[in-house]
């Protein structure tokens, strides 16, 4: 029996899953203690349910996830509104260092995948199906490069890449919170938290205020930025390079924020925009999690499971020892480490959810919430595509 849910039913199920995750997180100490995001908790439970239904032949669920993209764009547009020139300048060196760490991670993931593939006596191109294509790249890059690998003779590469990306989405989400928690508590990093002043944040005194009458204006500002962003995205596509769909909206939002900030002609309602962005992130993750097809992981052969285990171990070691130490060994570095687990094995929204869960438990981290979406959204996909192209042609 095939059960098809339209976009309204899909987002309704996602909301129920979010509520379930929040309910369990509030009552299960282990989930709260390890900072597991609520959408992941409820989503994994639902994904296991749909997997059992599929395996036993009871039912196969089909979702219309078109609203997932809408929620993703709204969230990243809200992130774009947080960017301004002064903050970007203040994080200049940290931005370069963090970008270097991401580039190194891309290379490590691919070298590990190729090395393990040779040890297991399988094609290095099969190994690449579990490298940075699905890890840093996520499902989008997996879908783009799977057919390319098939053209190079890797049978079922699209399925393998998608399955690996599915695994990474779960592993990165589950790992991020515990990594951040362990670093913070083991090294007593709350003592290193510095409350940033207004001159660094470039926020007015009403940043943390919320006014019901201003939410419509905030929604309108988001919609305008998204509309302008579609034009920017079309212009970027003329370069022949592939960018995430939300990049144009992020750029438009950043421009609107800076024009408003420096001209004083209009106000950007950051408090309300942040709230709307948070809701959009939760809905995006909810839909992404319920549409996971866990049975794809069961179809992986033992060598591929070994490859994925290797990527998981690499991610833990890299974030815990390398990212944390290079980024300063402080609270911000710990939050960044939890974020890298998210977009290093899945997607930037998962990174944001990991960091959000950690910061809700401990303290805010302006630095982490600036660097991760900036590098993860603007640079990682582009650099990853270049690296993947090199590795495919080199092999």
Residue ranges and their predicted role:
Residues 2-16, 62-75, 125-132, 240-252, ...:
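Structural signature of hydrophobic alpha-helical transmembrane segments
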Residues 17, 44-51, 64-92, 251-260, ...:
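Hydrophobic transmembrane alpha-helices of secondary-active transporters
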Residues 17-18, 169-262:
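Membrane-embedded hairpin module used as a gating/binding unit in multi-pass transport
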Residues 20-32, 78-90, 179-181, 255-270, ...:
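C-terminal ends of transmembrane helices
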Residues 24-40, 57, 61, 230-251, ...:
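Flexible hinge motifs at transmembrane-helix junctions and intramembrane kinks/re-entrant loops
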Residues 84-114, 165-166, 219-222, 275, ...:
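Entry/N-cap segments of selected transmembrane alpha helices
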Residues 115-122, 165-202, 313, 318-331, ...:
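Juxtamembrane and boundary regions of transmembrane helices in multi-pass small-molecule transporters
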Residues 116-160, 167, 179, 194-195, ...:
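Alpha-helical membrane segments and immediately flanking helix-loop junctions
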């Amino acid at each position: 029996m095939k059960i098809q849910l339209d976009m309204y039913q899909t987002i309704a199920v996602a909301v129920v899953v979010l509520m379930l995750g929040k309910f369990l997180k509030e009552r299960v100490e282990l989930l709260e203690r390890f900072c597991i995001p609520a959408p992941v908790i409820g989503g994994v439970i639902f994904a296991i349910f749909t997997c059992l239904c599929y395996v036993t032949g009871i039912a196969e669920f089909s979702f219309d996830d078109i609203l997932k993209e809408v929620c993703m764009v709204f969230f990243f547009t809200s992130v774009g509104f947080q960017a301004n020139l002064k903050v970007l300048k203040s994080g200049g060196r940290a931005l370069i260092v963090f970008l270097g760490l991401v580039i190194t991670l891309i290379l490590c993931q691919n070298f590990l995948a190729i090395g393990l593939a040779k040890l297991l006596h399988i094609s290095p191109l099969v190994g690449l199906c579990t490298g940075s294509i699905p890890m840093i790249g996520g499902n989008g890059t997996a879908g783009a490069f799977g057919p390319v690998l098939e053209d190079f003779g890797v049978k079922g590469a699209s399925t393998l890449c998608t399955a690996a990306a599915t695994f990474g989405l779960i592993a990165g989400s589950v790992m991020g919170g515990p990594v951040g928690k362990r670093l913070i508590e083991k090294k007593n990093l709350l003592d290193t938290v510095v409350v940033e002043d207004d001159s660094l944040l470039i926020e007015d005194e009403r940043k943390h205020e919320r006014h019901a009458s201003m939410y419509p204006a905030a929604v309108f500002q988001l919609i305008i930025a998204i509309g302008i962003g579609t034009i920017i995205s079309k212009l970027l596509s003329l370069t022949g390079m592939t960018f995430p769909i939300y990049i144009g909206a992020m750029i438009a939002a950043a421009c609107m924020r800076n024009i408003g900030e420096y001209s004083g002609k209009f106000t950007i309602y950051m408090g309300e925009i942040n709230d709307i962005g948070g809701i959009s992130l939760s809905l995006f993750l909810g839909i992404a999690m319920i549409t996971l097809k866990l049975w794809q992981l069961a179809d992986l052969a033992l060598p591929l499971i070994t490859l994925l285990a290797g990527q998981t171990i690499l991610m833990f070691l890299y974030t815990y020892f390398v990212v944390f130490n290079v980024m300063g060994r402080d609270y911000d570095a710990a939050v960044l480490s939890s974020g890298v687990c998210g977009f290093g094995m899945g997607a930037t929204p998962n990174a944001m959810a990991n960091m959000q869960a950690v910061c809700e438990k401990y303290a805010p981290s302006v630095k982490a919430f600036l660097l991760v979406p900036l590098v993860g959204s603007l640079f990682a996909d582009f650099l990853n595509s270049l690296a993947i192209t090199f590795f495919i042609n080199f092999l």
